[in-house]
């Protein structure tokens, strides 16, 4: 994160002599931009790492390929139609009231999962969109000069259904928010 925001006296060698076509969408590309994206991805992956730890520590019994930050709070693996694939013994719900750290982790989970629809914090919704774009589509960071025009017109004028547009400043704010949230998660885990 620091490397993506620290003041730079010279251009990075990987950014020199790169000739890009201007598509008038004010997109910006640089190694520092991608370091910010990698910071986001690394921070978001810590959620699932915490889930793996909790699955082992509390001996929940979720199969390795089914463990994620959502599944550790339930008692069964279900199909999309609601049919139960397998059940597991999940002692976490019983231990939440006596373990303040676990209680904090649970409420961070609630922010992320339920926050997509009902959270008063709009950053949670943006985090979900950014993560989905980084993993399955692509993210275009744009310069502030084009921010107002581009962010209002996003997908309409460019007809680019795979891209998610965000300004560099917004991405910075969201990564900083995620950094603070993951810090809280780790402190609660310890």
Where do the protein language model's features map onto the residues?
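Short, hydrophobic, well-ordered secondary-structure elements
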Residues: 2, 25-59
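Acidic, Ser/Thr/Gly/Pro-rich intrinsically disordered interaction regions
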Residues: 1, 15, 30-33, 58-190
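A short mid-domain helix/strand-loop element embedded in enzyme catalytic domains
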Residues: 1-30
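Generic structural signal for well-ordered, non-membrane alpha-helices
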Residues: 3, 7-10, 14, 41, ...
């Amino acid at each position: 994160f620091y490397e993506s925001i620290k003041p730079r006296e010279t251009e990075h060698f990987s950014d020199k002599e790169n000739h890009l076509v201007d598509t008038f969408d004010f997109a910006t590309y640089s190694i520092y931009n991608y370091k910010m994206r990698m910071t986001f991805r690394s921070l978001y992956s810590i959620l699932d790492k915490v889930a793996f730890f909790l699955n082992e520590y509390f001996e929940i019994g979720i199969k390795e390929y089914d463990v994620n930050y959502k599944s550790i709070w339930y008692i069964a693996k279900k199909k999309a139609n609601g049919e139960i694939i397998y059940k597991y013994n999940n002692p976490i719900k019983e231990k939440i009231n006596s373990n303040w750290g676990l209680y904090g982790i649970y409420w961070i989970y609630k922010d992320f999962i339920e926050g997509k629809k009902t959270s008063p914090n709009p950053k949670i919704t943006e985090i979900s969109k950014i993560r989905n774009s980084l993993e399955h589509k692509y993210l275009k960071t744009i310069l502030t000069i084009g921010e107002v025009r581009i962010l209002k017109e996003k997908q309409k004028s460019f007809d680019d259904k795979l891209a998610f547009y965000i300004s560099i400043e917004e991405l910075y704010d969201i990564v900083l928010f995620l950094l603070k949230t993951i810090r809280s998660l780790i402190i609660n885990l310890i």
